[in-house]
């Protein structure tokens, strides 16, 4: 009888220990999963101008545009809330890491305004700095661009407005170029989307004062502009993946992005 009593006690203790161990393991695993999620989120998203953005980070893979390497370390928001996009050379690998973010939210008709700090008019001919709408998976359609780029040729204009059609041949895109010469490190860029047109206007300084405006343009009547809500992208990258001709790293600072619906 005593033997049976002791066996029962031992069995109960064993079950209790297993429950404690299971509970402990579950807590640790849960904590690790939560930590993992937070770590992933910390490097894959960023909060800027009241919007959550995804960060393009492909590790050792090269993808377009370019193709290029893309790294989360090339993107950050400072204590003032300003967004930094930096083209950086990795000293360990010799790779140039590019920067891109895109909004989780989609935006439709209305005005899109970016306040920039830096000299995008003085970028190396192999660099591209873009502010744009883009529909992933439908390259050549549903895209509205402001791009600072000479496309690898130092003799070409450095400022580009481009609107891709909602349908049809991408080669029918509407595009205008301009030789940009800023008068300082602050500038503002805007496009407005409606169901019929896309209109552009840019400004010296962080203002939309008409006296500071330059290079206004509008798509022609009948051009098939996108009518879809689209994410907003900002990127800094190398044309065809070619290193800067001057070998210099570059940083662009975006003070704000604002969308005003219409």
Language model segments and positions:
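Sec-dependent signal peptide recognition
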Residues: 2-8
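C-terminal motif of bacterial Sec signal peptides marking the signal peptidase cleavage site
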Residues: 13-16
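Bacterial signal peptide processing site
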Residues: 18-20
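Low-complexity, Ser/Thr/Pro/Gly-rich disordered linker/stalk regions
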Residues: 25-129, 133-137, 143-152, 212, ...
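Extracellular/lumenal carbohydrate-interaction signature centered on repeated Trp-anchored short motifs
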Residues: 101-111, 177-185, 192, 225
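Short tryptophan-centered beta-strand motifs in secreted/extracellular beta-sheet-rich domains
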Residues: 112-114, 185-193, 198-202
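Glycine-aromatic-enriched beta-strand/loop faces of beta-sandwich-type recognition domains
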Residues: 136-185, 237
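Aromatic sugar-binding interfaces of carbohydrate-active proteins
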Residues: 181, 197-262
């Amino acid at each position: 009888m005593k033997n049976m009593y002791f066996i029962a006690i031992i069995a109960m203790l064993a079950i209790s220990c297993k429950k404690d161990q299971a509970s402990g393991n579950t807590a640790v695993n849960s904590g690790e999963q939560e930590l993992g999620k937070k770590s992933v989120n910390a490097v894959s998203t960023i909060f800027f101008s009241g919007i959550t953005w995804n960060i393009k980070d492909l590790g050792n893979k090269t993808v377009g545009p370019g193709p290029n390497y893309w790294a989360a370390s090339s993107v950050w928001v400072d204590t003032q809330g300003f967004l930094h996009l930096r083209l950086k050379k990795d000293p360990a690998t010799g790779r140039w890491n590019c920067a891109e973010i895109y909004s989780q939210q989609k935006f439709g008709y209305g005005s899109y305004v970016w306040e920039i700090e830096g000299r995008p008019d003085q970028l190396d001919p192999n660099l591209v700095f873009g502010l744009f709408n883009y529909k992933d998976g439908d390259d050549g359609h549903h895209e509205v661009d402001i791009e600072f780029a000479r496309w690898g040729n130092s003799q070409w204009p450095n400022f580009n407005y481009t609107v891709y059609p909602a349908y049809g041949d991408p080669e029918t895109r509407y595009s205008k170029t301009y030789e940009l010469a800023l008068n300082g490190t602050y500038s503002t860029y805007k496009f407005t989307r409606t169901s019929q047109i896309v209109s552009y206007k840019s400004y010296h300084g962080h203002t939309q004062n008409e006296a500071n405006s330059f290079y206004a343009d509008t798509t022609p009547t009948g051009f098939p502009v996108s009518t879809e809500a689209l994410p907003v992208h900002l990127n800094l990258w190398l044309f065809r993946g070619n290193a800067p001709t001057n070998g210099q790293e570059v940083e662009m600072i975006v003070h704000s992005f604002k969308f005003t619906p219409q």
